Regions:
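A short beta-strand-loop-beta hairpin characteristic of the jelly-roll/cupin
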Residues: 123-126, 130-132, 137-158
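N-terminal leader/capping segments at the start of a protein or of a new domain
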Residues: 19-71
Length: 191
């Protein structure tokens, strides 16, 4: 129930800005008197990472527990994995991928910025397959997408929630509309 409410609020907030491809990010903190204030309030553009996806980082931490430094920690290269002992809060927009284009994807196109390619010894069934050494929480905000795993695929729609535990996976949008997914990635130990 709570996850559905979160999904609905997040979908209204983020999917509503889909036309502009920018997302408003509001970050709060404390001033010198320990009063809650707005530190950052601005539009964050999605950056095209590849022909099939765009993304942006909202916030990144470099330690657990995180430092509340009041500095903008998201202003760094996008990449996929969170920093060691850190977290990454990000939005990814997957463009529709028609079968003809999908068939032409080069096998070496492991997603840009992935520090952990698929598990060794397991054949890669799609160029978008990859792995992050992280525990990931994800919410499909808009659109539909197929999450590929080693031996199966799962079709996901708006409002679906994913908990991914450092597994091989890939994302392919076989629909006609972009799919936006909100991710929180937390660094983990190797499984």
């Amino acid at each position: 129930m709570i996850s559905r409410i979160f999904c609905a609020i997040a979908a209204i907030f983020i999917a509503g800005s889909a036309a502009a491809s920018d997302v408003r990010r509001v970050v709060t903190g404390l001033d010198a008197r320990n009063h809650a204030v707005v530190l950052f309030d601005s539009s964050i553009p999605l950056k095209q990472d590849s022909p099939v996806l765009s993304s942006t980082n909202f916030w990144i931490t470099d330690s657990t527990p995180p430092s509340l430094s009041m500095q903008d920690t998201a202003n760094r290269p996008i990449g996929v994995s969170p920093p060691e002992n850190g977290t990454k809060f990000r939005l990814v927009e997957f463009a529709p991928l028609d079968p003809a284009t999908e068939a032409k994807l080069p096998p070496e196109m492991i997603m840009k910025g992935v520090t952990h390619p698929p598990q060794r010894g397991i054949p890669v069934k799609h160029p978008m397959m990859h792995r992050t050494r992280s525990l990931d929480y994800a919410v499909v905000l808009s659109g539909e997408i197929d999450m590929m795993l080693d031996d199966t695929s799962v079709h996901l729609k708006q409002g679906d929630v994913i908990v991914q535990q450092a597994t091989n996976h890939g994302w392919v949008n076989h629909g006609t509309q972009p799919c936006r997914i909100l991710f929180v990635l937390m660094d983990s130990k190797e499984p």
